Amino acid sequence: WNVIKVIWGSYWDQLLAKDKSGLLVKRMNECVDGEYQVFKAKGGSYVRDKFFGKYPELRELVSSMTDKDIWKLNRGGHDPHKVYAAYNAAIENTGSPTVILAKTIKGYGMGKTGESVNTTHQQKKLDEEDLLYYRDRFNVPLTDKQVKNVEYFKPSENSEEMKYLKERRLKLGGFIPERSSFAKQIKAPPKDIFDAFMKSTGEKEMSTTMALVRMLTALLRDKNVSPRLVPIIPDEARTFGMEGFFQKIGIYAHEGQKYEPVDSEQLSSYREDKSGQVLEEGINEAGAMSSWIAAATAYTNHDIEMIPIYIFYSMFGFQRIGDLAWAAGDSQARGFLIGATAGRTTLAGEGLQHQDGHSQLLASNIPNCISYDPTFSYEMATIFREGLRRMHEKKENVFYYITAMNENYAHPEKPKKCDEGILKGMYLFRENNNKGKTKVQLLGSGTILREVIAASEILTKEYGIDSDIWSVTSFNELRRNGMETERLNLLNPNEEPKKSYVQKCLEKRDGPIIAASDYTRAFSDQIRPYTDKSFYSFGTDGYGRSDTRKNLR
């Protein structure tokens, strides 16, 4: 970084030149911010006594100055000449970013109402006396009447100021801020890349995290997509099964490999490279998220479409960098956030610090964050493929949050005609009709869907109760659909009411609804208003515990 400090204004220059002993600079460095605020709130006499008066030599240094002269001693950030010099130096610098650190006064120009005064943020306007003071202080050419009417001063069209302003606006691309993108569209990967994940794994078991990593490995073989992938890992790359990326695409290091890694004899040893693609951020989630935002907004900032994929312990995502996630939404980011090792009972033995039971709820608060909690590899593949289509073919300004688990189990073949349901949030996974005495609707998401399937078998064998099993890939998307349906009906009272997707799925089904997830009950409770059936939710309210998966459940 090229750092330019603009600390003291021009009125200090003569005093600093006279200060041969360095005592003035010493005094400047002794004072803390709170003192500097008081100096500007109290006036010249106070500054003479409290700032210069500490040392006899400094009091003598300003003996020929009036209190008004001392009051004029300005801060660098309010000196047009110093600010100009700093800005000029900044634009002439090449090869590194520049930051200008300027010392200023809180509420500068507000007079008694706000200058160096601890007012609340409820102070929204100045009274007439303050406005007139502001006019006089900055020589704004307005009459008293114009000031009292709070009129703006506009320079004439031929003035130097107006010419300069227009020239700068044109160089910046126009008068109104505009989000433009001329990025070349990424060609969608062929569907056959995802075909392997639509098939049954047979007796072979794997986690949804491993399924995702295998998808990314397949995408790295696609010449159109591979250069645009940005895998970001703050920690635990090997836990997620991503060590194969180290040799394949390398870890980015701007100075290259500078050491022999301890695992150098292994096939998947750490390989750092100046042109590496993996961003290994260390245990720094804020830095990793910032890198993700940079890549996720490159389509508009740099006209380059990127596909950032940030994989992290789900507990250390939205909870730890929530404000950055909100900023990502505000910045219209496009990319994938993967909350790995998700689920409060699925990540066994890690205790309350690690066991995530609410990241999906946190994600639901960001309007353009599309979130899913898939159970099977075909669901993960369908969601990921749709994310690529929406963000990079349709160029929608959304980003995806997908939770992935570390529980290994077999994955079935993709049922027919379930794409719409997977993407909307739920689909009928299986019907158990054994002419039982009654029936229930069982809803499950993530790894807990498998517990729901097991519960269905118990209900049939031990209690003679039939059930329909629904895989809920996104309670969040179902809720959004329900709210949008409610809104349409509210705004169109004379039309036939529309039905939410949840209502369409369940209205003709018999029995109460039992919804279960590995998150707090509030997660599945979100869809309660969109059905008139009896609704029971099961979840993981409370803290996590260090125990086995079986005992936790």
Predicted regions and their residues:
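Thiamine diphosphate
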Residues: 1-412, ...
